[in-house]
Structures are given as C-alpha cells and as structure tokens.
Regions:
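Flexible "stalk/tail and boundary" regions
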Residues: 23, 39-41, 46, 62-63, ...
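A short helix->beta-strand "capping" segment at the edge of beta-propeller domains
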Residues: 1-12, 39-43, 185-189, 198, ...
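Blade-level signature of beta-propeller repeat domains, shared across WD40, Kelch, NHL, RCC1
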Residues: 256-299
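Short, solvent-exposed loop/turn segments at conserved positions within beta-propeller repeat blades
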Residues: 31-32, 71-72, 117-128, 166-169, ...
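Beta-rich, blade/repeat-based domains predominating
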Residues: 10-24, 51-70, 75, 93-110, ...
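Short loop/turn segments immediately following beta-strands, especially the blade-tip
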Residues: 174-181, 291-296
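A short loop-to-beta-strand structural motif that recurs across blades of beta-propeller domains
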Residues: 35-37, 75-77, 128-131, 170-172, ...
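Beta-propeller fold detector
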Residues: 7, 46-50, 86-90, 140-144, ...
C-alpha cells in the first residue's frame, strides 16, 4: 500500500461534514458553526449560508440551486438564486432521528438518510430507512432496515446507489429504478452481520469498521471514512481493503474526491464525534492527500 502525506486544507472548525467538490471548489458544512462553506481560490473557507438547525448533506439541483439537509428539524432546504434559504421538503414524518447525509442525483432526485434513534441522547439503536425527495419536494421512504445510513454515492451510469451503514459493519447498494425508487438491498462490502442488537456499545465493540463518509472512484472502488480506526480506506466491491490512509490521532468522519483532476482525497477530521466536546472546541479540520484513481459518479 502507498504511503500518504497529509496536508491541512483548513482548520479551526468544530466538526466538518458533507465535503463535496462542485464547480471547481471544495464545499463542506460545520455542524456546530451551523454553516455551509466554500473554499475560495485563496484557500479561505467562506461561509455561504447559515443553517440554524444544523447542516449536513449537500447537493445541487440540475439548475445549480444548492440543497442542504437541516438535521434537527428534519428538512431539506434549498438556497435560491436570490440567497434566500427555503424549505424544499419537510421529511419529519419519514425520519426516526435527525436527518443526516444526502446525495442528489443528476436528475435532481435526493436520497436522504437519518439517524433512526436519538444517538446523542443514548437511546437504543434502531434500523431506519432512506427517503427519496423528488425535485418538486414530494417525498417517500424508498428503503428500510438500514443501520444508520450515512455517506451515499450514485454510480456514473446513475443506476446504482451505494450507502454506508455506520453501525451495520457494512456498505450496501441498491439498483435505482427508472422512477427513482430503489430495488432490494444487497452487499457492496460486508464485514460481519450485527443483527438487531439494540445496544450501540455492543454493536461498536463487535464491528471491525464504522463506515461514515463515502466517495466513489473511476475503478468502482469506494473510499470510506472509518471512524472506528482513525483512517480512510479504499475498498473494492466484496470488501477487500486496497489502500489505507492513517490519520491518528484524528478520526475521519467524511471523505470526498475532488481537485482539478479528481485525484485529491479530502477528509473531514476531528478528535471524535461527541457533540458536547466538538461544540466546545475548534479542533475540526479538513485534510487532503493525492490519490492515484480519480473521482466518479455523484457527488
């Protein structure tokens, strides 16, 4: 495996998530600054919009309007051309916990995950689903039985959705039907079934990987943020680990492929994901390293 040198892109944040490379710029959110940011040509992160109920997943409609998940009120918001942030979809009834990550397909269909339970409040783990939000703002549940669906990507041919199951010890995938709904879930990479165990501590103890953020490359492999082991790993379908980027003592919580040639791996780093600690400190930062295989698919 290659040796990776890490660069710091930006630092001094609370907890970064949702990295995206869009229109030749790096975008991301800070949960606890409650902002969506874009890194400008001078390498400075500019706050684009404030999301009071905590921003998460990002994406763009075909007309270039930005969508952002508002976590705590379980909405998808749209940044209009005039700078107004409006409700694109209210998905409260479809979520059993905070709304979280999102991927927006080239046709404008958005797929949104949610926690499934009160993670920060210490509740028992419960499986949950994925919500499809159409360009007109209508929504429906299109998958169920996922263990904290998190990072998602859509293949370059727009026929497959791949999703991390953070507390499921696996990466799953679905066929995308012509109407935007999803087929049956199947494994992309499974590191051992954890079943219906409700105790989150036991699930984590029995897991070998905690797959958070996700990025797809042109060879069909995925980079994932492995929050359990302070690393980003490149995995081929079937579960073989091809490359490892060690980031200790930082944990990695989201990843993206970008840069002008699509061969820069961006990694959202922080000491942990504890809400109280990350709110109180500004140790969150964005790391990067060059990789050999470039970006594919969406985002």
């Amino acid at each position: 495996m290659s040796k990776y040198e890490l660069d710091v892109v930006v630092d001094g944040f609370h907890y970064l998530e949702g990295p995206r490379w869009y229109k030749n710029a790096l975008w991301f959110v800070d949960f606890y600054n409650k902002g969506v940011y874009r890194v400008n040509d001078e390498g400075v992160a500019e706050k684009i919009v404030h999301v009071e109920q905590q921003p998460s997943g990002l994406g763009w409609l075909p007309d270039s309007r930005m969508l952002v998940v508002s976590m705590k009120d379980r909405k998808v918001l749209c940044l209009e051309d005039n700078g107004e942030l409006v409700v694109h979809a209210d998905i409260w009834k479809h979520c059993e916990g905070h709304a979280n990550d999102m991927v927006v397909a080239p046709n404008g269909n958005a797929y949104v995950g949610n926690f499934g339970f009160d993670l920060m409040g210490g509740a028992d783990h419960k499986h949950t689903g994925l919500v499809l939000v159409r360009p007109d703002g209508t929504s429906q549940v299109v998958a169920e039985g996922l263990a904290f669906p998190n990072g998602m990507v859509i293949s370059a041919d727009e026929k497959t959705l791949i999703v991390n199951e953070l507390f499921g010890n696996k990466v799953s995938q679905f066929d995308i039907k012509e109407n935007g709904t999803l087929g049956e879930k199947r494994d992309f990479a499974n590191f051992g079934e954890l079943g219906d165990e409700p105790n989150l501590g036991v699930r984590i103890e029995n897991a070998s990987i905690l797959p958070d953020g996700l990025a797809l490359d042109s060879e069909g492999a995925v980079w994932i943020a492995d929050t359990l082991n302070q690393r980003a790993v490149r995995i081929k379908e079937g579960g073989e680990i091809l490359e490892t980027v060690d980031t200790a003592p930082d944990g990695i919580f989201a990843v993206a492929l970008g840069g002008q040639d699509g061969k820069t791996l961006f990694m959202c780093a922080a000491p942990d994901w504890n809400e109280a600690s990350r709110t109180a400190e500004t140790k969150g930062r964005m790391l990067s390293t060059p990789v050999k295989v470039g970006h594919a698919g969406t985002p």
